[in-house]
């Protein structure tokens, strides 16, 4: 990777040619981009994308990938003609009970900052890798909480008009692991709007949000629905995530992943009843708008894909991509995986679950240049 010296064209943003993208993603898979533009401020992001979009209209540019933390991406190794724009604008400010974070801020830093200011509401989202700007796109959630619970508005760049404006959270059409941003992005490359900044309204009482998730309540030894100290909740969440290999650790290949690869499917009540009647023992399920939410990890394991699948023969080579040995929903890079390895394993698991249960799992990460 070498600097191209073209930063002046992008308001001083850093520009590098022949830039490997794999080290910039949590899965550590991806191509060498033709050009990587790293924007350290929102002004650089705006100037860079306006220029690239002008070039696009003139038919003079490569496909453009906009990303930050790289925690929810599977990028095809074949996409070598990319111009990648990395958001590194990372400011975090607190005013009263409002927390504002620029898109490139490390998400867990946002959570910790809120807690250090005595604000509750984000603590269940501790330890989730990635950037603040990505959280509303997926409506990131964990342990009974979602970003949409506390998000008040986002500042976005409309790439069609070039205008920048604040959009209320009520206009973002949030759903389970989705939003208007995700629904409008055809392939993850031609995204019509880019998040520049997010704002959250949090609880200044010194208490957490109500603990809604049974596993977390058990870890805290409190009843479901009770509030607790946000810092204590954060510590419990981090402990739970670490036991599942869901806290990034460069030395642990179980954490080289995009987190849960499949979303928990929501099925019609009669589908759940048929499933419950066809297996021994209880089927984990939860009420959900429009049906019943099933546990994707349970479906994966019951379909024959246990933790660590495929397990290598004694003394034999390890597959380049395996399920985590700690969590059945995490597809992990064991050190040499390429995008084709990840997609092949994901396809095997999806097809296996569909064959056994008649339920099709949907991938949670953004797939760029590849599909199941």
Swiss-Prot record:
**Which Pfam family is one of those matched by this entry?**
FAD_binding_4
* Sequence ranges assigned to domain FAD-binding PCMH-type in this UniProt record: 29-205
Q: Which organism is it from?
A: Mycolicibacterium paratuberculosis (strain ATCC BAA-968 / K-10) (Mycobacterium paratuberculosis)
| Annotated keywords | Cell cycle, Cell division, Cell shape, Cell wall biogenesis/degradation, Cytoplasm, FAD, Flavoprotein, NADP, Oxidoreductase, Peptidoglycan synthesis
Catalytic activity field: UDP-N-acetyl-alpha-D-muramate + NADP(+) = UDP-N-acetyl-3-O-(1-carboxyvinyl)-alpha-D-glucosamine + NADPH + H(+)
> Can you tell me which family this protein belongs to?
Belongs to the MurB family.
- Name the UniProt record assigns to this protein: UDP-N-acetylenolpyruvoylglucosamine reductase
Q: Which prosthetic group or cofactor does it need?
A: FAD
Q: Could you tell me the superkingdom of the organism this chain comes from?
A: Bacteria
Which residues are catalytic? 177, 260, 364
Where does this protein reside within or beyond the cell?
Cytoplasm
Q: Name one GO cellular component term.
A: cytosol
Mind telling me which InterPro entries this protein's record contains?
FAD-bd_PCMH, FAD-bd_PCMH-like_sf, FAD-bd_PCMH_sub1, FAD-bd_PCMH_sub2, MurB, MurB_C, MurB_C_sf, Oxid_FAD_bind_N
State where it is primarily located: cytoplasm
The coding gene here is murB
The pathway it acts in is: Cell wall biogenesis; peptidoglycan biosynthesis
| Protein biosynthesis as UniProt keyword | no
GO biological process entries: cell division; cell wall organization; peptidoglycan biosynthetic process; regulation of cell shape
